[in-house]
Structure formats: C-alpha cells, structure tokens
C-alpha cells in the first residue's frame, strides 16, 4: 500500500499472517529486476487501491502473479484478478477490510476457530496520526502521574492556636458539624466557655486616681508658658482724689493725680 491510510493495516496484516508487507513507496522492478536487492517473487499480491498501486499491479501481470485489490466503484480493474468491493477511501473502512482479511486467512489455516471471537481488536488496523498518537500518550502519562500524587490534607485555620488536621470529609477532628448558627456558641461540644466579665464589680475595684506628678522643667522652652511672677501685697496707697468729670479740663500732659511710680 502506497497510501498512508493503508500502511498501518498492511503492516498489521503481515505481522498476523506472516506475509511480507510493502508499506510506502514501491520500488519499480521489485518483481521483474532480479539484480536488485529488493527483488521479490510473491505467490499473490494484495493491494489497497489499484489506482495508486498501479506499478506493482502492472509488474505482477508480467510475471503471472495473481492480484487481489480493494476496489471502489471508480477503481480501474485492469490486471486485477479478484476485486473486493469496499470503500477504499475511508480510514476505518480500509482498516476493517484488512482486519477481516487477516481473520479469514487465519481461519483458513486453522489457526483460529470460527466459533471463537478473534482476540485482536479492529482498532489496531486503523490509521493513526503520529501527532495525535503522541498527544494521547502524553495525556495518558499525565493522568498516571496525577493518580500517583496524593492530594494534600486540608487543615482548618485557627488564629491563635495550632492548626487542626482536617480529614478527607472536610470536618475537623473533634469538632461537631454545626447546622444552627443561631444557637449558643457555648453549647458546642469541645468549645470552652468564655470568661464571665462583671463590669459592675470591676468598677468598684478601680483605685482612686493618684496625685498628679510634680511638674518638671521641659527642655522645649517654646512649648511651656513662663511661670507667673509672685505678687507681693500692695502697700496702702493714699486716697486719691476723684477724677474730674470735666474731660475738657483734664491735663493730658502729666497733671493726673495717680502716682504711677509707687513701687510694689
């Protein structure tokens, strides 16, 4: 088979029946040129498509080799001895026809019984794209690695205490499942009761505020007010005469009766 879709099926047919497969490009002169290394003298020739494999079919007619071909409705039948009608353009159809042909050859040889199902799956004869096959193998390896890796055990985060291990079910060990969130938190098993705070009793225990500490001089002179100067008792001043009510006659030049020079 020179067609890529039939090469895998031809190789499987040769492996199961012992025939000599020729997959890929056919070397001209394989059946007629005896001096080349690839010379063959087959007893029968089976081709996937007589149109694409016209060279071996023509050479087989020169040396009287019977030809069996998988023929479609538009396939040429020149030099074809036995035509097997099928769809030779479909990947699955080509693989199925070669699988059935392999099974029939083994049954005629007596290698397998007709009453027993053949253990070889037909999928082995189907063409597989190398890129898709490599992608499937990579996905299978990734799945195998993912199965081997054990998932990490989750844990419940509790602030201020050690983490509590959580089993696969998701509920921490020793902590019951709480469904009623409106219930009293103290009733939950395993939870300590919070301390009772008596604000009325604590208020009576508050000590009286201590005396204000003595003020110390501050190093920041700009932020502290200067202390007030001590005030000495004023000496008895002589009775001053009542100021005159006549503002027009007051002497603003220093004739006032107030003595501003009295020292304190």
From Swiss-Prot:
Keyword Cytoplasm tagged: yes
A GO cellular-component term linked to this record: cytosolic small ribosomal subunit
Q: Where in the cell is it found?
A: Cytoplasm
The highest taxon in the source lineage is Eukaryota
Does the keyword section mention Iron-sulfur? no
Any Pfam family the entry gives: Ribosomal_S2
Q: Name the job this protein performs.
A: Required for the assembly and/or stability of the 40S ribosomal subunit. Required for the processing of the 20S rRNA-precursor to mature 18S rRNA in a late step of the maturation of 40S ribosomal subunits.
| Name assigned to this protein | Small ribosomal subunit protein uS2
- Specify where the region named Disordered lies, as residue ranges: 147-176, 188-264
The UniProt keywords, alphabetically, are: Cytoplasm, Ribonucleoprotein, Ribosomal protein
- InterPro entries xrefs: Ribosomal_uS2 (IPR001865), Ribosomal_uS2_CS (IPR018130), Ribosomal_uS2_euk/arc (IPR005707), Ribosomal_uS2_flav_dom_sf (IPR023591)
Question: What does the sequence similarity comment in the record state about its family?
Answer: Belongs to the universal ribosomal protein uS2 family.
Molecular function GO terms recorded: structural constituent of ribosome
> What residue spans carry the Low complexity bias annotation?
162-176, 226-243
One record GO biological process = cytoplasmic translation
Subunit info? Answer: Component of the small ribosomal subunit. Mature ribosomes consist of a small (40S) and a large (60S) subunit. The 40S subunit contains about 33 different proteins and 1 molecule of RNA (18S). The 60S subunit contains about 49 different proteins and 3 molecules of RNA (28S, 5.8S and 5S). Interacts with ribosomal protein S21.
């Amino acid at each position: 088979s020179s067609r890529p879709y039939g090469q895998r099926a031809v190789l499987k047919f040769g492996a199961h029946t012992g025939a000599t497969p020729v997959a890929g490009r056919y070397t001209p002169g394989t059946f007629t040129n005896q001096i080349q290394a690839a010379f063959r003298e087959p007893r029968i020739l089976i081709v996937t498509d007589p149109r694409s494999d016209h060279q071996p079919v023509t050479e087989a007619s020169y040396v009287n080799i019977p030809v069996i071909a998988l023929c479609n409705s538009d396939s040429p039948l020149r030099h074809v001895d036995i035509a097997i009608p099928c769809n030779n353009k479909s990947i699955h159809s080509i693989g199925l026809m070669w699988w059935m042909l392999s099974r029939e050859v083994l049954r005629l040889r007596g290698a397998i019984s007709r009453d027993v199902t053949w253990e070889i799956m037909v999928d082995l004869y189907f063409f597989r794209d190398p890129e898709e096959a490599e992608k499937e193998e990579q996905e299978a390896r990734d799945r195998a690695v993912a199965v081997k890796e054990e998932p990490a055990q989750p844990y419940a985060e509790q602030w201020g205490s050690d983490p509590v291990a959580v089993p696969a079910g998701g509920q921490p060990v020793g902590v019951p499942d709480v469904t009623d969130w409106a219930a009293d938190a103290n009733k939950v098993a395993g939870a300590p009761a919070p301390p009772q705070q008596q604000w009325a009793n604590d208020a009576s225990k508050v000590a009286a505020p201590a005396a204000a500490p003595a003020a110390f001089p501050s190093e920041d002179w700009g932020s502290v007010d200067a202390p007030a100067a001590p005030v000495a008792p004023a000496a008895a001043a002589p009775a001053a005469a009542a100021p005159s009510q006549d503002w027009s006659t007051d002497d603003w030049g220093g004739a006032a009766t107030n003595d501003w020079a009295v020292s304190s």
